């Protein structure tokens, strides 16, 4: 059975910098700093063997390879290496003539629950003179389990577990059991039959282009007659549903629910 309820969420952060590398071939003799390109990365862990790149950047290219160690800071980490994730290597090398390299990490899908809040802090082990105090040498990595999308997971019986409309206009209703079916004429769309009132269906579309932001889209559509909802004739005789422009509506394939504003 599916569940339909309400909510939202979102967070992001970045950091970067520039200066020079001291070699015989570079006229600028400023310090050579090395750091992670981002201070925060969220990884969508799927049921595959995919490795993700965590970029490392230097402020200048040098004429020699630079190899750094990669440490996991246990006191800032609750994900367990070997159980929740694995590193391809505990070192990272910036090749001669280059400014970037990648620490490669893989999440272990079967050992991560959708409700887990797992993350780790990685630290580059480098010479003291290579550390830029402004940005430091750490980065935080968050593991987020992403289940494969299958629209048929949302087909069948569904329970509307809460709605502000219930409290305002359907006083004796706290939950509502409805049926849903896949719309044969629209991609990734389901029809929620008799959503609030018999004869009035609602359609919602599932977006699948961003694994970390599985959003719901809904076009404006009528969901009741004014006579049935308000016991009066008003306007075009219909009450319309509009998707909020202020809050995100989203779904979870892992938990089989949609959260609609």
Model-derived segments and spans:
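Positively charged n-region of N-terminal signal peptides that target proteins for export
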Residues: 1-4
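Hydrophobic helical h-region of N-terminal Sec-dependent signal peptides
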Residues: 9-14
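C-terminal motif of bacterial Sec signal peptides marking the signal peptidase cleavage site
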Residues: 17-20
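Acidic/polar, low-complexity intrinsically disordered N-terminal segments immediately downstream
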Residues: 22-102, 106-161
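Ser/Thr/Gly/Pro-rich, low-complexity flexible regions
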Residues: 146-261
